[in-house]
Amino acid sequence: MSNYKSGFIAIVGRPNAGKSTLLNALLKEKIAIMSDKPNTTRNNISGILTNEDCQYVFVDTPGIHKPQQQLGRVLNKNAYSAMEDCDVIGWIVDGSQAFGTGDSFILKRIETLHKPVVLIMNKIDKLGKEQLLKRLMYWQKQYDFNDIVPISALVKDNLEELLKVFKGYLPEGEPMFPEEMKSDHDINFRMCEIVREKILFKTHEEIPHSVAVILERKEKRGNRMYLQMMVVVDRESQKGILIGKQASMIRSIRLDAQKELKDMLGCSVDLELFVRVEKNWRNHENKIKEFGLDELEQIDED
């Protein structure tokens, strides 16, 4: 393949900047779960876009933030690792917001890497033309970016231009992944993420940061798939919230997840959810690893 390009693009930014929304929009497929809760993404999720002259490998990193717990430090470590290994950094920001403390935290890290940095100014659908020009000028003063590309991941505005800019920073080389491959994460990981997404949408603020979802059993029964998952929280009170009055909350989560899992797997799904308390698990490195947030654990495919 003469002049073919392929490489890694780290998508970084503050929590809630729109990283996962952008990844899904670029791939035209749901690879990363989405929520309005900060730090929805925990693992570095690679989304792969292949066309006739370029293969883009996007790494959707956890939102970089000042950590309060061991889990937060692990999330930052995951993001930093992606930045160090990539060919170009795509720093996504909410174009309607000013440069803040969280951005300073990211900038300090970027400055040590000496990598090309493309500023992705997201959520421009919220801005008028004059506002957009002012925000572009404002961000140009914050850092010597290699490029600045205004987009709206939500309405898929200017994404082709963003791909064109990224391509300019990728090295020539053969595709690293098969053309049909959209993610380097297996189906087990993605199934657990769907359940976690439903929990994020339905529970109170204290639950999202405290929850991990583990696939414990997967079994094909005729034309149906049986799945058993364990939902882990770190306090008894959170277990009560997750289960709900007369098990109403866990039932609602199960039914919503079951519907999406059916669409993903192409067959009927029987999903069982159990809730377990692991006190203060977010501060124990061995538990973080056990739950697949530092290194993904996998269940063998049947």
Task: Give the positions of each predicted feature.
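P-loop NTP-binding site
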Residues: 187-302
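Active-site glycine-centered loops adjacent to acidic/histidine catalytic or metal-binding residues
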Residues: 60, 122, 152
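Canonical P-loop GTPase G-domain recognition
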Residues: 116, 125-183
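Conserved G1/Walker A P-loop phosphate-binding module
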Residues: 1-77, 81-83
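Conserved, well-folded catalytic cores of nucleic-acid-processing
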Residues: 29, 48-52, 67, 82, ...
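Conserved C-terminal guanine-recognition region of P-loop GTPase G domains, centered on the G4
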Residues: 50-55, 77-148, 219-224
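Catalytic P-loop NTPase motifs of RecA-like helicase/translocase cores
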Residues: 41, 64-66, 99, 127-128, ...
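Conserved glycine(s) of the Walker
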Residues: 18, 158, 249
